[in-house]
Design a protein with these regions (language model features):
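Fungal secretory targeting signals
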Residues: 1-17, 274
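N-terminal pro-sequences and low-complexity stem/linker regions of secreted or lumenal proteins
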Residues: 16-386
Length: 386
């Protein structure tokens, strides 16, 4: 019955676009992001399967999520901000908000989202349940679909694809893998059981090893590939939002396998690293000041910066949202990208031209800088208190 339902729904789906590219990067040629759910650093690192994975790459020990709950972290990971979002309900970011997708497309770098057990390519519903009535796919864990710049575009929707590990014959991920047609940038979201949200860190670790171990030796996947395995947020809201990050893949230099990196990173580092690797512009938001992963910075020449005040750093928890457009208590505008950060920054990168054009005459306030210091609810941007 469930399979018949999927077949019926498939008639409404967007046709999946298969597009490859071969834009050389300075440190990697393919970047894959995999998010797991709601786990404190120590508990994630203590799982034997995640420890196994960490021993095959670089452990990022000082990685921080943006806030709580889940959805704003997914939004931040591609948009360079979460705009005060403090819930998991359906949101649609206005079309003028650019994302990393715009950066990638500016240089014709292929991209896709692969969402486990999403019923079909381009699905925009809030969730999809399995035959037992449990959540498999949820929209709040799909960063692309919460942006109108994607959901209003048939072409972009065709790159938001399904992944099935039960029936690989209907899985866009497995089809693209078999055909050596995976894109250069990927965001992979396990389902609500696989990611640990409705299960446990043990289940998540088991799934991660089962899924990734064969891919680490698959030549259709490993093509100077860097994989980031991380979490959307920590489990405990009362402590600092420190999460585990692991970098693996054949792009990791052999001398760095099994090492740790204690540099300060955030979800915005995911965007900054992509910009540095492929000489892409920025979004003019929190991505401008974010640290690039050290192994990538070794190739790009980026400077890894530290907080200038250790006591101040310890006072940032990133465990609650500052105010903003999506905040349930506010009625504030989307802040403008800081257009003064166009090449006038420590890294010298320009802001994407379409972003400059869109926001050139905006009177919206802005609060972004090229500092690595990122606001939280206790240290909100001016005028954006929660």
């Amino acid at each position: 019955m469930l399979f018949a339902k999927i077949l019926a729904l498939a008639g409404l789906s967007a046709a999946a676009t298969v597009e490859t590219s071969s834009v050389k990067g300075k440190a990697f040629d393919r970047f894959v992001i995999i998010y797991f759910e709601n786990q404190n650093y120590d508990k994630a690192f203590g799982d034997p399967n995640f420890t196994w994975l960490a021993n095959k790459g670089i452990t990022l020990t000082n990685y921080f999520a943006a806030t709580h709950p889940s959805q704003p972290n997914y939004m931040a990971s591609i948009a360079g901000d979460y705009f005060g979002l403090d819930g998991d309900g359906v949101v649609d970011s206005p079309a003028e908000v650019a994302t990393v997708i715009d950066l990638l497309e500016s240089k014709n770098i292929s991209w896709a989202h692969y969402e486990e057990d999403m019923p079909y390519t381009g699905y925009t519903g809030s969730s999809y349940k399995n035959s037992r009535g449990r959540n498999d796919y949820v929209r709040k864990h799909n960063p692309a679909i919460m942006h109108k710049s994607v959901s209003d575009s048939t072409d972009r929707l065709s790159r938001v694809k399904n992944m099935s590990n039960i029936d690989t014959s209907r899985s866009s991920f497995h089809t693209d893998l078999e055909n050596n047609a995976l894109p250069q940038w990927m965001f992979i979201t396990p389902n609500m059981t696989s990611d640990g949200h409705d299960s446990s860190v043990t289940t998540a670790g088991t799934w991660c090893r089962w899924f990734l171990e064969p891919l680490l030796t698959n030549s259709n996947f490993m093509q100077n590939t860097l994989v980031l395995v991380t979490w959307d947020e920590s489990e405990s809201y009362s402590i600092r939002n420190n999460i585990l990050g692991i970098l693996v893949g054949d792009a990791v230099p052999s001398q760095l396998v099994g090492t740790t990196d204690a540099s300060f990173y955030s979800h915005y580092s995911e965007i900054a690293t992509v910009s540095a690797n492929w000489d892409l512009p920025t979004l003019g938001r929190w991505d401008v000041g974010a640290n690039v992963y050290q192994m990538v910075a070794n190739k790009t020449g980026d400077t890894i910066r530290t907080w200038d005040n250790a006591t101040e750093f310890q006072s940032y928890y990133w465990n609650d949202a500052y105010g903003g457009y999506f905040n349930s208590n506010d009625n504030l505008p989307i802040p403008a990208p800081n257009l003064s950060l166009d090449s006038n920054t420590f890294n010298g990168r320009h802001i994407l031209q379409s972003v400059k054009d869109t926001w050139a005459n905006s009177d919206a306030p802005t609060y972004y800088t090229d500092s690595i210091k990122v606001s939280d609810s206790q240290h909100p941007p001016p005028g954006f208190s929660p």
